[in-house]
Amino acid sequence: MRAEVLAWMQAQRMTEPGDTVVCAVSGGADSVSMLHVLLSLQDTLGIRIEAAHFNHHLRGAESDRDEAFVRQLCASLGVPLHTGGGDVQARAAQTHESLEEAARKLRYAFFDTLPGLVATAHTQDDNLETVLLNLTRGTGLAGLTGIPPKRGRLIRPMLVCTRAQIEACL
């Protein structure tokens, strides 16, 4: 998987030597794998790896356990960690957005405060789901493009991997 991610990142020109890449780490398999893979590639790519965790506070103590896990993981790996959080339910009520949309907007607003590039752990499976959802919404050919590998400061190095590949590596 490491070689696939490296080749993908180079083909997509995701980073340049000297870049800081902040991995968005939820605590789930995809983002934890991404953190490990990018750490293993930092010398090869000449990049600096940091991490970020956004606590949505939607699952009570479970959300706090996710944050504690990410804190412990980053400490054990020696990776600087940026943390943030927000009241997703309050935003959704105020803006009449769905919880998912409110969470996404708060999370991406947090990402905007981070240094360098921000890596999210979207996979081939996520991309397929996005394409199918776009088709059902009637987006036409534009919807067939799916999740872009790089958009602005956001990079998606794991788009080359399936969820099954990621789970097999953990």
Predicted features and spans:
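Core alpha/beta nucleotide-donor-binding catalytic domains of modification enzymes
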Residues: 1-25, 29-169
